[in-house]
Amino acid sequence: IINFFESRTDDMVGVITFSNSAMYVLPLTQNKEAIKAAVNATAGNALFQTNIGAGLTSSAALFSGIADTGSRAIILLSDGAGRIDAPTQQKIKDWFSRFQIGLYWIVLRQPGGISIFDENFVPRDEEQPPPQIELYEFFKTFRSPFKAYEAEDPKSLELAIQDINLKEKKPITYTERLPGKNYSFGLLLTAMGLASLLLCLKILEVKSFK
C-alpha cells in the first residue's frame, strides 16, 4: 500500500481508520513521509467492531472544500463488514455523488470465509444476509463509480492495488506559480533613453529661445 502511494507522486492522500468509530489520522496531503507514517500507524490491533458507516462519511468529508482537480477515490480496506442504518446509507450515497468520489472496496477475506461474489449464496430462512453481502449490495446502488476486490494474501492484495492504479489515470489539473522575470536592465535602458530624449528637447528649447 505504501509503495502504491509513493509511486503516485502528484496525488494527495488522507487516512481515516475506524473500528467502533472513525479516527482522523491524516488530512489530504502530498507529504510522502507523513503518508507513510500514517499507513504504518494503522498496523496495530483494533476493537472487535466495524463501523464502516463512520469510516466512509469521515473519508468523504476530507474532500469538502477541496477543488476537484483530478481523480477522487476512496480505497476502503477492511477485514470485516458492518451494517449501516438507512439514514447513514443515504448520507454516504449523497456525499459520494456530490463530491464525485469513486469507491474501491478491498475485502481482506479469511480463508474459507464467505465470498461477496458468490451468487449462489442463500442465507438461512428468516436470517439477514451476512454484513459483507449486504454491504456489497448497497455499494452497487451508488451513482458514483464502485468496484470491489477480495484479497486472501499479499499477492492478491497487490493485484487489487495494481488494478486501482491502472484505473485512476485521470489527468490532474494544478496551478503552478512561475518565478517572475527580471526586467530591471531593460527598464533602466528605457529610462536612460527617455532621459536622453528629454535632455535633447531641453537643449533645442534653449536654442530656440535664444
What are the residue ranges of the model-derived segments?
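Juxtamembrane amphipathic/hinge helix adjacent to a transmembrane helix
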Residues: E150-K181
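C-terminal signal-anchor/stop-transfer transmembrane helix together with its immediate cytosolic
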Residues: K170-K210
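Extracytoplasmic/secreted envelope proteins and their assembly/folding machinery
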Residues: I2, K32-N40, G53-A60, Q89, ...
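Sec-exported extracytoplasmic/periplasmic mature domains
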Residues: I2-D10, N40, G44, A60-D68, ...
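Short, charged loop segments at secondary-structure junctions
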Residues: S21-A54, F138-F142
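Von Willebrand factor
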Residues: I1-P27, I52-L56, A73-L77
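VWA/integrin I-like adhesion module and closely mimicked acidic/polar interface patches used
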Residues: G80-T141
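DG-centered beta-turn motif at the end of beta-strands
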Residues: V15-N20, S59, G70-K91, L103-Q110, ...
